[in-house]
Amino acid sequence: LPHILLSVTVPHILTLDAQVQLAEDLVAAGANIIQTEGGTSSNPTHSGVLGLIEKASPTLAAAHAISHAVSVPVLCASGISNVTAPMALAAGAAGVGVGSAVHKLNDPLAMVAVVRSLVEAMQSVKVASAAK
């Protein structure tokens, strides 16, 4: 399917090695994009920035491992915030996926503000990378 993209989410309930193997198998079967997730496997014990990092750590680890194993783009999702989105890119993800960061809000203006914050955070990584 040359003009149709297929994105497949690798379940976080698998071990990291099993996630990598599944991602490789999915790409071999025709998946064009692999998405990681963290699900409920991480329960932050801290608040603030440290809590955001704790929450996203399973999906960040999966993005790192999978992006080094497959030749297709990897999207990092679950627990992604303006703090952790740059970490996802540094881990090897081609981009991020957000859901609850947006849909938990009741105000469309706040939803747009969250997306703008994510874009700004990721652009700062690209600017820093280009400066090196």
Give each language-model segment a name:
Residues L1-C76, S81-K132:
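Alpha/beta enzyme core
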